[in-house]
From Swiss-Prot:
NCBIfam families xref list: PRK00228.1-1 (NF001266)
The protein's name in its UniProt record: UPF0301 protein Veis_1517
Organism: Verminephrobacter eiseniae (strain EF01-2)
Family per similarity comment: Belongs to the UPF0301 (AlgH) family.
GO CC term, one of those recorded: cytosol
PANTHER family on file: UNCHARACTERIZED PROTEIN YQGE (PTHR30327), UPF0301 PROTEIN YQGE (PTHR30327:SF1)
One Pfam family, short name: DUF179
Amino acid sequence: MSFASASINLTHHFLIAMPGLEDAAFARSVVYLCEHSERGALGLIINKPTDITLKGLFDKVDLSLRREDLGREPVFQGGPVQTERGFVLHEPMPDEGRSATDGSAYASTMVIPGGLAMTTSKDVLEALSTGAGPRRVLITLGYSSWGGGQLESELAENAWLTVAADLSVIFDTPAPERYDRALSLLGLEVWMLSPSAGHA
């Protein structure tokens, strides 16, 4: 059964780029999939830091950042789409999962089945600036997206490996080690892969 014909849902999974994936935006990338359905997929690259720190980002949007533990953390390159827009991947706040009109913590939050949330509204940055807000965050500029059937085609062409997401890779593993750490979830190391390898 091919990926194109199988009904799969890879929400809350990692996509791990195979060595043969030559697109510069995705080479050696680990993508956390926030959403995957028959309409397409949306994810954030979690292992490609930019030169911008969170303190620099907060300065740019005229907010102070009281949490010193976050100030030196990098902003990540989340993907090639809307690279001027920020995306905050974080642990859900206690009242998320309700719509904004029902009192959700932030104006624009997607609660991801599996234990994370992604917020695109500035209010999450405002909460972080005061020392409130989510405890653990990863902030990207831009995101990655695939149209309906596009990701399935790339999987069938062996462009990606997939594995259920492990939050420790996102929040507890240094960025340069995330690719190898994600592979280790499959029991693999980089030297075991070849550009023409199949699916794990």
